[in-house]
């Protein structure tokens, strides 16, 4: 069985730890903070088998160099660091071109890891899918999606469609605890969504207890996330009201997605 554990970092980051059965060697996803990772490894008597990086932002990559140095000093081995080839991330020594390398077979993990190209938040953003668990970095959040720092709306829209097409039971391990803020916007865009209202109540209760709202599931996100709900009439109506100065009488789904993301940016 693959066990997935969250390490809290910074204000709202999650660094994910992947451990197969009782193996002592584990993988971490997007270790922005070296100290919390080392504290976790030492507290649980674990060793680091490798690092999986989704994109180049510092809060996801800041711990790479120190973790590589730590493994070299303590074991004499070179730590495997996987990441997107197109983003030229310092410390990544196994660069992945997702159009070429779509499956990784990693030591200490029983199941293959699928690599998905999901540009939008950054130009070369990738995601990892293993044992029904999706590590999607800053592409898909519960109730929302990442800002478009480098990619285009068309790229992000395509990436989200790709993720939305995964099986409903796929667990979504995003990299930030943004859920409540996202749901506040989601309810403004989709005010009559009863499932969204119920999920907001559930998420609010979890956060009040200091618990994570992550993982979500693809099935849940399809029902509550406005960025996965396409041309849902209530969302279209909300966008038209927000952008009432524009003629939206005959536009496509991408235009609505673009406007929805612009609205979220200023919400």
Curated annotation (Swiss-Prot):
One of the GO biological process terms: methylglyoxal catabolic process to D-lactate via S-lactoyl-glutathione
Cross-referenced Pfam families: HAGH_C, Lactamase_B
Positions that bind Zn(2+) 2: 59-60, 138, 176
Record: residues binding Zn(2+) 1: 55, 57, 121, 138
Top-level taxonomic group: Bacteria
Enzyme class per UniProt: hydrolase
InterPro entries in alphabetical order: Clx_II_MBL (IPR035680), Glyoxalase_II_hydrolase (IPR050110), HAGH_C (IPR032282), Hydroxyacylglutathione_Hdrlase (IPR017782), Metallo-B-lactamas (IPR001279), RibonucZ/Hydroxyglut_hydro (IPR036866)
Cofactor dependence: Zn(2+)
Record EC number: 3.1.2.6
Catalytic activity: an S-(2-hydroxyacyl)glutathione + H2O = a 2-hydroxy carboxylate + glutathione + H(+)
SMART domains reported for this sequence: Lactamase_B
Classification via CDD domains: hydroxyacylglutathione_hydrolase_MBL-fold (cd07723)
Cofactor note: Binds 2 Zn(2+) ions per subunit.
Pathway(s) of this molecule: Secondary metabolite metabolism; methylglyoxal degradation; (R)-lactate from methylglyoxal: step 2/2
GO MF term (any one): hydroxyacylglutathione hydrolase activity
Keyword annotations: Hydrolase, Metal-binding, Zinc
Subunit structure comment from the entry: Monomer.
Homology family: Belongs to the metallo-beta-lactamase superfamily. Glyoxalase II family.
Record HAMAP family: Glyoxalase_2
Physiological role: Thiolesterase that catalyzes the hydrolysis of S-D-lactoyl-glutathione to form glutathione and D-lactic acid.
Protein name, entry field: Hydroxyacylglutathione hydrolase
Organism, scientific name: Shewanella oneidensis (strain ATCC 700550 / JCM 31522 / CIP 106686 / LMG 19005 / NCIMB 14063 / MR-1)
The encoding gene: gloB
